[in-house]
Amino acid sequence: MSRRNRAPKRDILPDPKYKSQVVAKFVNHIMLSGKKSIAEKIVYGAFDKIKAKDASANEVEVFEKALESVSPMVEVKSRRVGGATYQVPVEVRPERRQTLGMRWIIDAARKRKENTMGDRLAAEILEAVEGRGAAVKKREDTHKMAEANKAFAHFRW
């Protein structure tokens, strides 16, 4: 284990278009190999497609609603007791909830069949809002796993 202090959390500057830290963090998650301008084009393009589908909706609010419907409340962590390894259900911290939600939306979007990443992302976000899609299924599977291992909750540390 490291003897150094934990690195301090860095503040994320809000993104230039929507002035939202959540969107800025999402852009950073989309980004590959430091290509932020491309990541911004993808995210903003997806948001434009969401806006085109429903003109009355605010795209950032739609995204935050999707993120909320995908973010897990509980997850399982492996805990070794004696010779056995148990899957112990633990509550997810708010920051990790957000990060996992973003990661799952992106992973699900990358596996979709649409032509561009912007199309895939928009479709996945819209499905997440409706409670469908691969990212929502991932959350349900995680919750089922935690529910199935509820008996080991007393191994929490």
Curated annotation (Swiss-Prot):
HAMAP family for this protein = Ribosomal_uS7_B
| GO cellular component entries | small ribosomal subunit
Recorded hits in CDD domains, A to Z, give: uS7_Bacteria
Gene Ontology biological process terms from the UniProt entry:
translation
Q: Which organism is it from?
A: Francisella tularensis subsp. holarctica (strain OSU18)
Which SUPFAM superfamilies would you find in this protein's record? Answer: Ribosomal protein S7
Q: Name one Pfam family in it.
A: Ribosomal_S7
Instruction: Give the record's family classification.
Output: Belongs to the universal ribosomal protein uS7 family.
Q: What are the UniProt keywords, alphabetically?
A: Ribonucleoprotein, Ribosomal protein, RNA-binding, rRNA-binding, tRNA-binding
Please name the Gene3D superfamilies in this protein's record. Answer: Ribosomal protein S7 domain (1.10.455.10)
Which InterPro entries does this UniProt record tie to the protein?
Ribosomal_uS7 (IPR000235), Ribosomal_uS7_bac/org-type (IPR005717), Ribosomal_uS7_CS (IPR020606), Ribosomal_uS7_dom (IPR023798), Ribosomal_uS7_dom_sf (IPR036823)
Described function: One of the primary rRNA binding proteins, it binds directly to 16S rRNA where it nucleates assembly of the head domain of the 30S subunit. Is located at the subunit interface close to the decoding center, probably blocks exit of the E-site tRNA.
Q: Name one GO molecular function term.
A: structural constituent of ribosome
Q: What is this protein called?
A: Small ribosomal subunit protein uS7
User: How does it associate, per the subunit comment?
Assistant: Part of the 30S ribosomal subunit. Contacts proteins S9 and S11.
